[in-house]
Amino acid sequence: MKKKLLSVAAVASVFTLAACGSNDEAVINYKGGEVNKADVQDEAYQKAGAQIAFQQTMNKLLEKEYGKKVTDKEVEAEVKKTKDQFPDKEQFNTTLQTAGIKNEKEFEKVLRTQMLLKEAKSAKSKVTDKEIEDRFNQEKVEVKASHILVEKESEAKAIKKQLDEGGDFAKIAKAKSTDTGSATKGGDLGYFTKGKMVEEFENYAFKDGVEGKISDPIKTQFGYHIIKVTDRKEKKDFTLEKESDRIKKALAEEKSAQVNPNDIYRSLMKKYDVKVENKDFKDAFDLDKQEQQQMQQQMQQQQQ
C-alpha cells in the first residue's frame, strides 16, 4: 500500500512559485482555460516548474475531457477502499505524509486524476465482438503437456534420440530439464490454454494430432524444448454467452495497460490547442523529444 501511495505522490506535487509577477499570469493557454503561476507554485519552481506546469496542464485537460465520467462518490469509494487497508487513521495519515501527500483532501485530488487517466485509457481500449470471440476460442481448448528444456540444441537432439529409443520421458526430464518448476514433476506442465506459453511452444502444443507424440527440439527464447502433449480437451459448460463479459473486461484491461499516457496527452494538447507561453517550459511539453532522449539513455545503458 505504501508503494501505491508513493506512486500516487508523483502526481500530487503542487509547487510554490518563487518568481516575481502576478500569480494570475498565464503560463499555458488552451481552448476554454489556462494554467497560471498559482497552479505551479513552490520554492522549487526554478528546477521543477516546467514539469509541474506540464502535469497541472494535463490534469486540467483530463478533467475537462473526462471529468463527467468520474463522480465524487466513485472517488470517495476509492479513498475508503484504500483507508480500509490500514489498521487505523493515524497510520493512513502517516503513510500519506511519507508519500508527500499533505492530507486526505489532497489524496482525493490525486486519486481523481488517476481515475481520469484510467478513463482516458479506457476510451482508447475498445473491444470488438470479434476479439471477444477469438479469445473465447483460444480459451475453450486446453491441452496437457510435458516438456524437457535444455540450453543447447546438441543436447536436445541427444535427448530426443534417447526418447526415440524408448527412454522414460519423466525420468529424463527430472535428470536433465533446466525448467526447475516442472522438472521435479517429470516435466509435467498441467493443462493450459492458448496465450499462456510462448508462441513457438504453442504452435506445436495446439496442433491437431500431436497427442502422445514427442516433438523434435523446438527453439524459444528460453532454450530448446522437447514437448509431449498428453491430452487435449474442450472445457465443459464453457459458452460464449457465459464468458463474454469476463473476456471483454480482461481484454479491455490488457489494452488499457498498453496505452502510452503520452499518446493521451498529445491528443489532448492538440484538441485544446495548448500553447506554451513560457519559453522555459517548452521542453516539458515536447513529448517526442523526451521519448527520444529516453530511448538514447536506454541504449547507452545497454551498451555499458
UniProtKB/Swiss-Prot annotation:
It is found in: Cell membrane. It is a lipid-anchor. Residues 140-231 form the PpiC domain. Residues 285-304 are annotated as: Disordered. This is Foldase protein PrsA. GO terms for cellular component: plasma membrane. A lipid is attached at residue 20 (N-palmitoyl cysteine). Its EC number is 5.2.1.8. One of its GO terms (molecular function) is peptidyl-prolyl cis-trans isomerase activity. It catalyses: [protein]-peptidylproline (omega=180) = [protein]-peptidylproline (omega=0). It is an enzyme of class 5 (isomerase). SUPFAM superfamilies: FKBP-like, Triger factor/SurA peptide-binding domain-like. It holds the Pfam family Rotamase_3. Keywords: Cell membrane, Isomerase, Lipoprotein, Membrane, Palmitate, Rotamase, Signal. Residues 1-19 form the signal peptide. It comes from the Bacteria. Its main location: membrane. Residues 292-304 have a biased composition (Low complexity). It comes from Exiguobacterium sibiricum (strain DSM 17290 / CCUG 55495 / CIP 109462 / JCM 13490 / 255-15). PROSITE patterns: PPIC_PPIASE_2, PROKAR_LIPOPROTEIN. InterPro entries: Foldase_PrsA (IPR023059), PPIase_dom_sf (IPR046357), PPIase_PpiC (IPR000297), PrsA_foldase (IPR050245), Trigger_fact/SurA_dom_sf (IPR027304). Plays a major role in protein secretion by helping the post-translocational extracellular folding of several secreted proteins. GO terms for biological process: protein folding. A lipid is attached at residue 20 (S-diacylglycerol cysteine).
